[in-house]
Amino acid sequence: MSAKSAISKEIFAPLDERMLGAVQVKRRTKKKIPFLATGGQGEYLTYICLSVTNKKPTQASITKVKQFEGSTSFVRRSQWMLEQLRQVKGIDPNRDSAEFDLLFENAFDQWVASTASEKCTFFQILHHTCQRYLTDRKPEFINCQSKIMGGNSILHSAADSVTSAVQKASQALNERGERLGRAEEKTEDLKNSAQQFAETAHKLAMKHKC
């Protein structure tokens, strides 16, 4: 089981929440925990997770989850409601960068994702979630690449393409229906003409027979 799957199962599932995405990060300015609950020092892995509640009305939140060295379990550390997110900074819109900042009402963190692609995926999910669940004040996405902000546009583009294809197919069917209708009319006319010709021929045959 991957770390993200384990986090989803261990941290969010028991609270009837669904994890939408997560990104493994470390601080740009390295910071160690000087004292753990066990009384010693140690390294740890940090994940920034985005989740929503299964119960309505849906609430979205961002949670900081840690896994300490030597442990197989995960610990929920900090959590913010999505409404508290004020700014998402991508650092450099002109190149793939793993660095990013998150500004909340009462906190500010500077992170480096494990990879630029992982950050990109998380940003796309985060942007889409903000557009879907936040009706009032939405966070600013600053210095983000167009492909990150385009996640939602891609969905709309795909939807537009499908709609266009359906419209074209419908138009083609209508045109085909009209052609079939005209063909049926011609067939009916030919049928009537043939029937009239047969009746006339029969009458002539009977007349000559008499």
Swiss-Prot record:
* Major place of residence: cytoplasm
Q: Which cysteines are joined by disulfide bonds?
A: none
Residues modified to N-acetylserine:
S2
Which UniProt key words apply to this protein?
Acetylation, Coiled coil, Cytoplasm, Membrane
GO terms, biological process: regulation of SNARE complex assembly
Q: Quote the PROSITE patterns the UniProt record gives.
A: V_SNARE
Q: Name one GO cellular component term.
A: cytoplasm
SMART domains this protein is in? Sec3-PIP2_bind (SM01313)
The v-SNARE coiled-coil homology domain covers which part of the protein?
151-210
| Pfam families with a match to the protein in the record | Sec3-PIP2_bind, Synaptobrevin
Specify whether Nucleotide-binding is a keyword of the entry: no
- What does the subunit section of this Swiss-Prot or TrEMBL entry state? Part of a ternary complex containing SNAP25 and STX1A that can be dissociated by NAPA and NSF. Interacts with STX4A.
Q: What is this protein called?
A: Syntaxin-binding protein 6
